Amino acid sequence: MSTQQALAQANEHALSQANDLIKVGSKLRALSVLRDLLSDRSQWHSSLEQIMSLYVSLCAEQLDYQSLRDGIHHFKVSIMSQKEFSIVPLENIFKEIITPIEQKVDELKEKIEKENQENPLVEQNEISLIDPQQTLLFSYMKYLFEAYKAMIEVLTRQNTKFEHTKFDHSKFDSTLLKISTQALNYCSKYQRKPDFMVLTELFRSSIEQLFKVPSLDTVNTHIEIRFHQLTVAISLGLYLIAYKSIEDINIMLFSLLVKPKPVVLATYYQKLAQVYWITNAHLLHAYALYKHYVYNKNYNMNFTQADSQLYSSVLLVAALSSPIQEVNQNQSLLQFDSQSQRAMGLASLLSLQSIPKRETFLVDVRKVTNEVYPELADLASIFEKKTSPLMFAKLLEPKIKFIEGHAQLSQYLKPFLRVVFTKIALQVSKVYEVIKIEEFIKLVPFYTKTQIELYLLESIKRKLIGARIDHKNGVIRFGHYDFDSAKISDQLSNLATGVGKALNMIEPEKKQQQHDKLKKEVYVKIINSLQDEHRRILARKEIIEKKKIYMEQQDRIKKQKEHEELQKKIQEKVARDQQRLKEDMERREKEQAEEESQQNQLDQTINAIDKAKVEMKAKIAKIAKQLYILERAYREEELPVVESLQKTKAVEDKQYFESTQAEFLKLHREVHDRNVTEKARLNRIVPEYQKFTQAVIEERKKQLPALQKEQEKRFQEFLIQQEQDVQERKAKREKARIAAAQEKARKEEQERERLEQEHLEQERLEEERKNAPYVPPSSRRTFRDDDDEREESGRWGGRRGGDDFGRSKADEGDRWGRREDAPPPRRDEGGDRWGRREDAPPPRRDEGGDRWGKREDAPPPRRDEGGWGRRDDAPPPRRDEGGDRWGRRDDAPPRRDDAPPPRRDDAPPPRRDEGGDRWGRRDDAPPRRDGGGSGGFGGRRDDAPPRRDEGGDRWGRREDAPPPRRDEGGDRWGRRDDAPPRRDGGGGSGFGRNQGAQGDQNDSWRSDNKKEENKKDADGWQTVGAKKRY
């Protein structure tokens, strides 16, 4: 058999075993079986994909993302074991991981949102309660994120725990891009900011690996991932992560790529412009748009005329929206404060050594913005011309309306208006010294008075203009009141320029003569200095060559130093890793010692608390008794004092009552007199009152029939509605009852078919047993001969539901091994007596039953050659009337391995009552039947069928077990082909007998069973010949 065939067979076996475990409800054991298989597989086979699919579904049901991560790593190792492999199976597994969980999350989220919309008040009143559906949703979202994280780790890095050889992960670039995009979209869709931050750190850790092994495709893949990460970060409002993302892109573009693609650079500058806009760096934002426009214009073949018009218009408005810089900017650039450092850091992303000047940048922008919208064609010229401040706002009014109405330009409206305001303020400050506030407000119609004052103060703070707001006189006074030298120098230079122009206009001929004379002198000097200039040029060329050589040497030295530093960093990293591992080991040992110390301390504390409780209880009892005695003494002493106080209080109360009663009678008489007087006064209006009330009552009587009729109509409608509701509820209940009845009938039909199939299978096994050849005892192997074989195959240990027992010599056909220190076997009343240890409790047999001595050190029983203990590869044993039928564990499938199940060491010793075996019940054993049967386990289950009391043993039958049957009126146990003949004596439990053996046919238990041959038992079975039927 080839290796691939062996792998396929082993995989199919594991898959079938896992499916069997799933059918009986043991999904955790099925998951463990598949995990063990994947961890042992280092070679690829196509059947592994099916196994991995089942493994993924089990992990999703259990929400076990740790097992999922390990399984993905093992599956990756199996795929990479091929010389030429395909990543399609890995992509299919990733799809099976993601798709069902995303659907489940969407369903739960929609359900929760729907419930919240239907019951908003319930949601507000139950804020403090934990919603189980919300908790389940968070569990699924946690599992989905951990799955994404595990898949990204598998595709980007090597896990030394599972992978022992280095591998080029660039083959997974396409899959990595797809999975990373889905993970980032998941964070954006469900607003998972913490998960998004974990993903960004995971991506940043891969940059170091890119520097070690740079690959063009891998770098481009990571750049695309960072672009998508930047978009998601901006949508989530995580601007610090967005800045780090653009920094990573800058490093990978200009450090790892020799010549980046123009398309990638255009996208980079577009994303960079978004970052600058968020940070309010409007000038750098416009500069990034300028770069983006240039790359698209020169390299993008799909760049249409409409795109060019839109991009150039956006660039022009963005450039003009950049704030006007200070006149004397050198002082601010020389200050190494945090703001300047921040500005330089942002400018470095554009490969700039300093912040560009606004005027220079506007000149460059005018060269490339010739295709703007017609409405903005003269916008730049309006800003450049010296226009009157009284007309500046009116000229820009249509431009402002166009910008406000355009979708792509409207975001620049606020900074554009700020620049327009600053421009107007600067022009007004040069024309006027004093201007009324109302007049100045008219010059800026798009701002309110409060906004104008605020922006004017900001301009003064930035030293763009010099002004003071005089609210007392309602004016604005312009001028630099600190006598700034810059203002004075501007006035002097303007005066010199004006005087020079006046002189040229007064004496033009004299000026021309002087100019010609100066020109001739210059020509003579140039001719005389030609040789000297030539020598200077040659010397300069030589200096340049030397400087070039020096620069090349410096570059080589710098690269060598960088290489040495990189090697040094690698060595330091290895040393740090080794030190970290050592510290981790020491830390684990220390933590283990601390845990042991804490546990000991905790035990001591608990003992001390228990002791203190006992002492405190005694003290409390003593103090309670003392308080009881003291209280009784107090009450005996205070009794005379209380009686005297009570008498005094009674006299005082009587006096108080008499005085208050006299006062009350006096006041009551006064009130009565006033009421009589008032009644006499009001008697004159009684007729009018009676007349009015009688009119109102007559009017109400006329309206009463109509109101009664309307009320009767509403009542009848209510009754009809109630009747309809009752009929609808009845119909729903009837429909549910019919569905339940149909489901019950379907399940009963399935159960009947299953029982019939098991019955036929049992008959087939019985026919095989009847036709098996006889094996003489001399050709069988003894227990002692198979000692080594049992130890190697792991067949020692307790049988399910049974107890350990000793071995004895063979007696009348059975070859049972016996320990050397055990007494010889004996038989009482036709039964079996097996060897036991001298220190074991004495066995007993009541009414033909067995009592097996239990030894702690005895080997486990097994059923070889007709003895006790069922072989794992044999069919499950049965219990037919009078014999033992060992039930299988309800919560476990049939065992295929040789390993014994765990046995409870604290189980009670076995006993036999009323002619049946009573074995110590295991926690995982089937329920026993009380009374009349051997092998009853534990207390009787409420759902078990009634037992049979008339003779013989009756074992509880599992729901899925085959129906028991009788052969020839007695017990007929199916035996293995290699089983020995049974013992001749009666009693004990009859295990598979040989056809040639002459057993005792007149045993008491067998005779009793024949009497009950044609009677129905409690389960509804009737014995007819050798079969059972309903």
From Swiss-Prot:
GO biological process: formation of cytoplasmic translation initiation complex; translation reinitiation
Location, primary (coarse class): cytoplasm
Compartments in which it is found: Cytoplasm
Gene Ontology CC: eukaryotic 43S preinitiation complex; eukaryotic 48S preinitiation complex; eukaryotic translation initiation factor 3 complex; eukaryotic translation initiation factor 3 complex, eIF3e; eukaryotic translation initiation factor 3 complex, eIF3m; multi-eIF complex
A molecular function (GO) term: mRNA binding
Domain PCI: start-end pairs: 308-483
Keywords: Coiled coil, Cytoplasm, Initiation factor, Protein biosynthesis, RNA-binding
Segments of this protein annotated with the region Disordered: 576-603, 737-1030
Pfam name, any one: PCI
InterPro entries: EIF3A, eIF3a_PCI_TPR-like, PCI_dom
Composition-biased stretches (Basic and acidic residues): 576-591, 743-771, 800-931, 939-985, 1003-1019
Parts of the chain that traverse the membrane: none
Coiled coil: 94-126, 527-620, 720-772
SMART domains from the UniProt entry: PINT (SM00088)
Role of this protein: RNA-binding component of the eukaryotic translation initiation factor 3 (eIF-3) complex, which is involved in protein synthesis of a specialized repertoire of mRNAs and, together with other initiation factors, stimulates binding of mRNA and methionyl-tRNAi to the 40S ribosome. The eIF-3 complex specifically targets and initiates translation of a subset of mRNAs involved in cell proliferation.
Subunit structure as annotated in this protein's UniProt entry: Component of the eukaryotic translation initiation factor 3 (eIF-3) complex.
PANTHER family: EUKARYOTIC TRANSLATION INITIATION FACTOR 3 SUBUNIT A, EUKARYOTIC TRANSLATION INITIATION FACTOR 3, THETA SUBUNIT
Family the UniProt entry places it in: Belongs to the eIF-3 subunit A family.
Descriptive protein name: Eukaryotic translation initiation factor 3 subunit A
Lineage of the organism: Eukaryota, Amoebozoa, Evosea, Eumycetozoa, Dictyostelia
